[in-house]
Amino acid sequence: MVGLYGIGFWMPQVIQTFGLAPLEIGFLTAVPYLFASIAMVIWGWHSDLIGERIWHVALPLFLAGAAFAWSATGAPLAVTMAALTLAAIGIYAAVSTFWSLPTAILTGTGAAAGLALVNSVGNLGGLAGPSIIGVIKQATGSFTAALLFLAGAMALGVGRTARAGASPSPAIPRAGE
């Protein structure tokens, strides 16, 4: 949720650093979400098709982390927009599969409690992440370190997801089973 809320709150500000008008910022901000919404559907469908979840969460998070790091390089607007678009694709593709994990592992009351806990912790990340980005931006005067913070958060997500995949868990059914 750190990346989801981080890109949602701060992408317009990152784009604004290129000196664009508010209308241009608005249009450019919509582009990553257009591609991310398409990727989200396709990636979720692919995960259902082959019945795999862990790597369908970890790989997009890796993409998002690499893209956030790429966007921190101070590249021209077109390159930064490409990087932010890939970051959005990675985040939203991961989210499309992520929510199937707790219910695949937990059942009954445990599933309800597990989903509540995951949602609560995620919302804390959604609260803290954008605030941390703001503090970093204010302290450094640019978004470079803040975007690297987001890259690091995605790397933690990849590691945690891969570690969860190494734990024995019941088979995850394919869609329609």
Residue ranges and their predicted role:
Residues 30-34, 116-124:
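Transmembrane alpha-helical cores of Major Facilitator Superfamily
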Residues 21, 134-153:
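A membrane-interface helix-boundary motif in multi-pass transporters
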Residues 1-45, 95, 99, 129-130:
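Extracytoplasmic gate region of multi-pass secondary transporters
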Residues 22-23, 108-118:
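Loop-to-transmembrane helix entry/capping segments in MFS-fold secondary transporters
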Residues 39-52, 137:
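Helix-to-loop junctions at the C-terminal end of transmembrane segments
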Residues 51, 101-112, 141:
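Paired intracellular helix-loop junctions of major facilitator superfamily
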Residues 148-177:
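Multi-pass alpha-helical transporter architecture, strongest
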